[in-house]
């Protein structure tokens, strides 16, 4: 993939996700069945709308069945799945239904709290939708297909991911909110985020919305209804980006993100990589204890691998006020972080859950809408 971001004159090449690999391999399968010819490359539209030409690394086909593989290319972001082959089998059917499942090397969800139901293959919603749509577009409306995604190296590669901590067992996940992998080289990536902030400031904006990533971006636009023109990604660099807003003299910052990401800031963790600091359960337990939560709830929350899973216990026990307490602590920590440098920056916070929607905000949402319209 020949697309880049730049830092200090050096190019960082972008790549494509496992979800894009699976969609491309699935399309190659359908094309080979329909044409009865080998396919060496396919054009696919990613979940984010980017059109890519993807090489096909392996091809095999017969009258109603085909197998194809695409090699994962993460660009200059060398993650656990970079270079591995993502295989897809497609069997055509006559019932007009297109179904998708995962095979060898694709993990299975064993716990609640993630975006995949217990027992299902770990194919996230966005790539699942994209794979099905890609096959339907190539196949037409009158034929159906059974699609199986698998990765022979998946179980071994998954040991280098956080899947087991999330209750995903047996392999990798098929991921990709946008379908594109953007290199996360820290210095280069932080510089690119700063450049976007500078651009917004130069356009005359004096207040900015910081989000960790695509989920926060979607929530701001689709749930809160705020303008996309105020949004900048902070990735995992919360402290760095807060300092940058101060350097650039923004007056107001609104941080909007999934609770599992922002909860860390309430305890003074300003770089939110899970590999660097993951105290989500401990922070929740401490705050619940201060609210007088029973020991049984504290023990249940401590055992949870995700804040989504913990949310079920918290809601059942009637302690959802913990979210209000924590967002106020996120605000206080952030403003204290900026306290000793001028100019002052007002920080507000909105957190949400994938399953439960809005959890808490430092101001009434209608007040925030008025301030940020």
Curated annotation (Swiss-Prot):
E.C. number: 2.1.1.195
Pathway recorded for this protein: Cofactor biosynthesis; adenosylcobalamin biosynthesis; cob(II)yrinate a,c-diamide from sirohydrochlorin (anaerobic route): step 6/10
Keywords: Cobalamin biosynthesis, Methyltransferase, S-adenosyl-L-methionine, Transferase
GO molecular function: cobalt-precorrin-5B C1-methyltransferase activity
One GO process term, biological-process aspect: anaerobic cobalamin biosynthetic process
One Pfam family here: CbiD
Catalytic activity, reaction form: Co-precorrin-5B + S-adenosyl-L-methionine = Co-precorrin-6A + S-adenosyl-L-homocysteine
Domain of life: Bacteria
Similarity annotation: Belongs to the CbiD family.
HAMAP family: CbiD
Protein name: Cobalt-precorrin-5B C(1)-methyltransferase
Species of provenance: Listeria monocytogenes serotype 4a (strain HCC23)
